[in-house]
Amino acid sequence: MNEHIDTTCVQGGYQPGNGESRTPPIIQATTFKYRSSEQMSRLFDLSESGYFYTRLQNPTNDTVAAKICEMEGGAAAMLTSSGQAANFFALFNICNNGDHIVASSAIYGGTFNLINVTMRNMGIECTFVSPDCTEEELEAAFRPNTKAVFGESISNPALIVLDFEKFANAAHRHGVPLIVDNTFPTPINCRPFEYGVDIVTHATTKYMDGHGSCVGGAIVDSGNFDWMAHAGKFPGLTTPDESYHGVTYATEFGKAAYITKATAQLMRDFGSTPAPINSWIMGMHMESLGVRMERHCANAQKVAEWLNADPRVSWVSYPGLEGDKYHELALKYMPNGTCGVISFGVPGGREKVSSFLDHLKMVSIATHVADARSCTLYPAGTTHRQLTEEQLEEAGVGIDLVRLSCGIENADDIIADLDQALAAVQE
């Protein structure tokens, strides 16, 4: 039966048997008991599936990963301890010293740092391109050693909608996968695999948890990218892994090869696994994701329209606005809505922007987005503080930009708070 995604939010990933709990149980355990040392050996050889140590896998984590996988329409998925870990694993799983990445310049500041500084120090180079680049400019960014293309479905905080098909076509012409962070719209509003994206990541900390209570991340593989067709580019997947007695992931695990390698190698070596209690809580919160996203988007639409009509605001960026530069792309890829985050400009310089934030009462200042409580931030002074003026411009983050995450409160109360804060900085 083909069920609606709202139903998958509730029912996905877990089907209880007769007499079993209707809600997924929590397996808060580090290790698992076996009666046979031979069976344990098979687990370590990857010749048999099962659990032996939560640093690699845990039943609770896998249940929630399966739910997200179903929602995205993927072939395999895994959870990580944070969205940052998810993006790192997604790239490092196929990139090594001497390799190259093409990435959209309009991405979260922490991810920009990960790619531009940390991974560069590991010998992995990156060419950043504007999400608005022409096909010719995008083609020029590729090198013979390019292994992946990365972007965000809706960029944080500039709210630029990525043209999936343009980036996917370029990636596939060069025999590499397109990896997209789908945190902001969630699979409720956007299913990137339907438009040629190969791998999706999430900061589940955001809308999926939705209550500011659990840090986490997820990686979902569509199973559509043919690693063996480009075997020379991806030896980690297409040649024997010495650390697992010569297993070749692409031939042994098929559509699950990418996630199996990330679990067996990267989780083993980096240990970025979420605590089962965090996954369990997040899984419970995901049951209301469809309902919450509808409210987040409705609130953001109403607030964005109000801001757009207010002369005290210099500009508003929200893909749901008809006049927004990315409205047509949003209608194409996210016809049911975008997200609950708005960016807008408060004129007068950094001090004026900071003063506006300081005058807010209900809307809190927080390094967060996408939970039940409305919050705001000044990205140029916080999340993107490490970027140069030129890099800020490339990322679409001006010095007047305010990021507002609309919660699920009454939209009129959000507007009233913004109104009084704008009035205060005019005095």
Where on the chain are the PLM-derived regions?
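Conserved N-terminal alpha-helix of the aminotransferase class I/II PLP-enzyme fold
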Residues: 36-88, 110-118
